[in-house]
């Protein structure tokens, strides 16, 4: 009976894992960017870059000058100063003299039953001058001067409602950073691949574009005002469809931000994200859940069979299992390497194989913590 279960676990796991790697994630990994049609002139519609910030003086000091290096003729920058107690207000006053297209609005308090981030985004969108809104965070930096042009093109030129972009993290030489790099690419493989499959279900507010008019028409974050974190993902999950959304896979259209400095901060942030994912549609939760379950069964069954056949000196069966696991490992490495190059133009150090095994614990432990704390605000 034990052998049967191990074989079932491994067989089911490797079958589903193979399906995700070959049929889903491969869409992002081996995506080929099409050439832009020549001879078609689109109006360069105005864009508002929206950033909400609370006590982000040091980040804004770097971000704002970087934004005004963008190669796009019609844009302004709106900074929502959300109850900052540092030197943010003074910095903005000084920089608005230097950059006439820089605007700011200050929030002195947040209404009850509304999370601060959602209130700040909503206020910023309401006072934005332009209909095309491009969101990022204060700790993010665009990696090229084509960021605005590339990220807003689907909304401006193709009539899309959403444009979903990639946001990565700066590299550091430590285990946490390598895990963050791995998990970021894995998460991107989900939402970019399903987006290419005309089934988008999430995005990141660090690099996201949509129209002000659409946001106001659907009354913004109505229905999840009090949700702590995940405002971007739940908003996209609620309203993005295969016809109104486009994913942008281009290293010139990405942002990079500083990663969390310790595991405690990282896990707190991840718990908020996982809590937000509870508000996804049932179908979309199945997309991620099936991967997590099959991943666990693959590793439990695979390691169990290797031990069983190894102890029993049944080397022919041992080699069959080892070969299948090796094939999956090679495929995983190839997909992560190719996807990283497609998304951000380089391959950060991430120890994909060892972190893939660590994901077994991450998915279940953090998921359990999130479930137990689901009523905690």
What are the functions of these language-model segments?
Residues 45-48, 76:
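Cell-envelope/extracellular polymer assembly enzymes that use nucleotide-activated donors
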Residues 65-74:
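Short, acidic, metal-binding catalytic loop of nucleotide-sugar glycosyltransferases
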Residues 1-41:
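N-terminal membrane-anchoring/stem segments of glycan-assembly enzymes
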Residues 292-374:
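Membrane-embedded multi-pass helical conduit in multi-pass membrane proteins
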Residues 73, 81-91, 140-141:
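A conserved acidic beta->alpha catalytic loop
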Residues 155-187, 213-216, 222-288:
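Catalytic donor/gating beta->alpha subdomain of glycosyltransferases that bind UDP-sugars
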Residues 133:
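Short aromatic/hydrophobic "clamp" motif used to bind/position activated sugar donors
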Residues 103-116, 120, 124, 130, ...:
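Long helical/loop segments within the catalytic core of UDP-sugar-dependent glycosyltransferases
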């Amino acid at each position: 009976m034990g052998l049967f279960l191990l074989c079932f676990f491994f067989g089911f796991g490797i079958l589903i894992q193979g399906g995700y790697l070959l049929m889903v994630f491969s869409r992002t990994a081996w995506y080929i960017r099409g050439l832009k049609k020549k001879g078609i002139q689109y109006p360069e519609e105005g864009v508002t870059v929206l950033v909400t910030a609370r006590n982000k003086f040091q980040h804004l000091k770097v971000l704002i000058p970087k934004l005004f290096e963008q190669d796009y003729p019609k844009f302004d920058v709106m900074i929502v100063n959300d109850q900052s107690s540092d030197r943010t207000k003074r910095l903005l006053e000084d920089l608005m003299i230097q950059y006439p297209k820089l605007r700011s609005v200050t929030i002195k308090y947040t209404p009850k039953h509304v999370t601060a981030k959602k209130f700040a985004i909503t206020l910023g969108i309401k006072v934005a001058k332009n209909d095309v809104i491009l969101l990022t965070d204060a700790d993010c930096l665009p990696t090229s001067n084509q960021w605005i042009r590339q990220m807003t093109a689907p909304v401006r030129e193709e009539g899309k409602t959403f444009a979903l972009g990639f946001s990565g993290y700066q590299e550091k030489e430590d285990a946490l950073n390598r895990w963050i790099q791995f998990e970021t690419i894995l998460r991107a493989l989900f939402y970019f691949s399903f987006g290419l499959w005309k089934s988008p279900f999430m995005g990141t507010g660090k690099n996201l574009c949509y129209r002000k008019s659409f946001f106001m028409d659907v009354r913004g974050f109505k229905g999840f005002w009090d949700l702590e974190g995940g405002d971007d993902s739940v908003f996209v999950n609620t309203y993005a469809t295969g016809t109104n959304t486009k994913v942008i896979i281009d290293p010139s259209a990405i942002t990079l931000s500083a990663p969390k400095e310790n595991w405690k901060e990282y896990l707190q942030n991840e718990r908020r994200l996982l809590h937000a994912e509870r508000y996804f549609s049932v179908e979309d939760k199945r997309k991620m859940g099936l991967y997590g379950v099959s991943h666990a069964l693959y590793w439990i069954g695979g390691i169990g069979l290797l031990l069983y056949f190894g102890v029993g000196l049944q080397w022919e069966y041992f080699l069959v299992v080892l070969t299948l696991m090796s094939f999956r490992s090679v495929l995983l490495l190839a997909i992560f390497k190719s996807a990283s190059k497609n998304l951000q133009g380089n391959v950060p150090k991430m120890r994909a194989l060892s972190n893939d095994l660590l994901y077994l614990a991450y998915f279940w432990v953090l998921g359990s913590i999130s479930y137990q704390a689901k009523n905690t605000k």
